[in-house]
């Protein structure tokens, strides 16, 4: 029997193992059910860090994740994202040739002294595909300048595009002043924002992201290894993303790895040593995979529930979600998950539009709601004909009178 609370109706549905649930932050391990037996977050030797699940977006661990820090060459992740978006839009192709200008020549630019380079020379004609690898694998500052000039006409214009995407992605603690990440006043980011840029790279420009797993690149007879040492770690399936270092920034690393269908992204900023940033990132990723799992309980178009509809050309409405639901939960707790839904009103009246929000799905663990998603109409339901609506009106009156 339905119980009405302030014109909202709650219907409890015990879900089978097909249903799962939400996020529990590892930063609050005390809130976990004791049978989960999740130890605390490992001690991480860095100024700031974060660990998120790629699909659910849930934060599993964090410390000083919103503190603004010098990103160093993590900046190149946004450079790469802008390039990937431009190629996705058809503005240029990997086979296009880029003529290298003087501003991308290390010898003529003292700011490049001692920094990571692809070793370009003025007048060279280099395919976009090679410059991208110079950025993503070799962390070449000269390659960043060459691609910025080619893609936007100037470095300043390209930086403007970078900051436009900062706004579009909703990043709260990031602003870029350079295309390469060398120290500059007013340039900053945070561990959280860098993890979100990594998430955007994987989601929005997968062709661009696929380059990050390549372990080496040779240009003009100079062979350089990918600076992300975790690519060689056989205990993790790491396929990206980017390192960064300046004296001011310390040692930074954003890394992503998969285990089955689960993908995690870690961001470590202000690490102490070159190898230390890898060790700390590995701690986070290993801990996340060992003690959490991400499940996909509801898919777009799959009916979660159905409800009677009044005054429509259909008697019932199929209800579900308008996008796939991913939930990150303590490993082994899926069997304990339940779900319920709440309608925004006690009755559904036609017309109803496809994807119209009519309520909320609550995912529950140990009796607590730990995640929510909008409950939507899966198919449009127009108004019924005149006689059908009259009949529904009479039925509804009896329903109100006699319950």
From Swiss-Prot:
Q: Which domain of life is it from?
A: Bacteria
Question: Where would you say this protein principally sits, based on its record?
Answer: membrane
So which residues are the signal peptide here?
1-29
Catalytic reactions on record: Preferential cleavage: (Ac)2-L-Lys-D-Ala-|-D-Ala. Also transpeptidation of peptidyl-alanyl moieties that are N-acyl substituents of D-alanine; a beta-lactam + H2O = a substituted beta-amino acid
Keywords assigned by UniProt, alphabetized: Carboxypeptidase, Cell inner membrane, Cell membrane, Cell shape, Cell wall biogenesis/degradation, Hydrolase, Membrane, Peptidoglycan synthesis, Protease, Signal
A GO BP term here is: peptidoglycan metabolic process
- Pathway info: Cell wall biogenesis; peptidoglycan biosynthesis
Matches recorded under InterPro entries: Beta-lactam/transpept-like (IPR012338), Peniciliin-bd_prot_C_sf (IPR015956), Peptidase_S11 (IPR018044), Peptidase_S11_C (IPR012907), Peptidase_S11_C_sf (IPR037167), Peptidase_S11_N (IPR001967)
The record's section on Pfam families has:
PBP5_C (PF07943), Peptidase_S11 (PF00768)
Q: Note the topology in the membrane.
A: Peripheral membrane protein
UniProt xrefs under SUPFAM superfamilies: beta-lactamase/transpeptidase-like, Penicillin-binding protein associated domain
One GO CC term on file: outer membrane-bounded periplasmic space
Instruction: Give an example GO molecular function.
Output: carboxypeptidase activity
Enzyme class label:
hydrolase
EC assignment: the record states: 3.4.16.4, 3.5.2.6
Record: active site: 73, 76, 139
Task: List residues binding substrate.
Answer: 242
Where in or outside the cell is it found?
A: Cell inner membrane
Q: What NCBIfam families is this protein classified in?
A: PRK10793.1
The role this protein plays is: Removes C-terminal D-alanyl residues from sugar-peptide cell wall precursors.
Return the similarity comment: Belongs to the peptidase S11 family.
Q: What is this protein called?
A: D-alanyl-D-alanine carboxypeptidase DacA
Q: Which organism is it from?
A: Escherichia coli (strain K12)
């Amino acid at each position: 029997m339905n119980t009405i609370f302030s014109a909202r109706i709650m219907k409890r549905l015990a879900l089978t193992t097909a249903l799962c649930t939400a996020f529990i932050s590892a930063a609050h391990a005390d809130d976990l059910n004791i049978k989960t037996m999740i130890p605390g977050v490992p001690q991480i030797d860095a100024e700031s860090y974060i660990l998120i699940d790629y699909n659910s977006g849930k934060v599993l661990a964090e410390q000083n994740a919103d503190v603004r820090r010098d990103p160093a060459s993590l900046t190149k992740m946004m450079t790469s994202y802008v390039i990937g978006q431009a190629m996705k839009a058809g503005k240029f192709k990997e086979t296009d040739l880029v003529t290298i200008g003087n501003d991308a020549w290390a010898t003529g630019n003292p700011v490049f002294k001692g920094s990571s380079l692809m070793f370009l020379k003025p007048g060279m004609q280099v395919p976009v595909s090679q410059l991208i690898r110079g950025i993503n694998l070799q962390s070449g500052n000269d390659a960043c300048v060459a691609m910025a000039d080619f893609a936007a006409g100037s470095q300043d214009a390209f930086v403007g595009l970078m900051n436009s995407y900062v706004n579009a992605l909703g990043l709260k603690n990031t602003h870029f002043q350079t295309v390469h990440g060398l120290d500059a006043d007013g340039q900053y980011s945070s561990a959280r924002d860098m993890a979100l840029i990594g998430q955007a790279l994987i989601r929005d420009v997968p062709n661009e992201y696929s380059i990050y797993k390549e372990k080496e690149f040779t240009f003009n007879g100079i062979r350089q290894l990918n600076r992300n040492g975790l690519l060689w770690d056989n205990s993790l399936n790491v396929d990206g993303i980017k390192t960064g270092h300046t004296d001011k920034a310390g040692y930074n690393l954003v890394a992503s790895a998969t285990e089955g269908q689960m993908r995690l992204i870690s961001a470590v900023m202000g690490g102490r040593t070159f190898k230390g940033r890898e060790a700390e990132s590995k701690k986070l990723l290993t801990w996340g995979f060992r003690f959490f799992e991400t499940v996909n309980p509801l898919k777009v178009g799959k009916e979660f529930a159905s409800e009677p509809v009044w005054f429509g050309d259909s008697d019932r409405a199929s209800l579900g979600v308008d996008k796939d639901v991913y939930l990150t939960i303590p490993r082994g707790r899926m069997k304990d998950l339940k779900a319920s839904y709440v309608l925004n009103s006690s009755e559904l009246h036609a017309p109803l539009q496809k994807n119209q929000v009519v309520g909320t799905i609550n995912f529950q663990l140990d009796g607590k709601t730990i995640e929510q998603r909008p409950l939507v109409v899966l198919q449009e339901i127009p108004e019924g004909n005149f006689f059908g609506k009259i009949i529904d009106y009479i039925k509804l009156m009896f329903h109100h009178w006699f319950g």
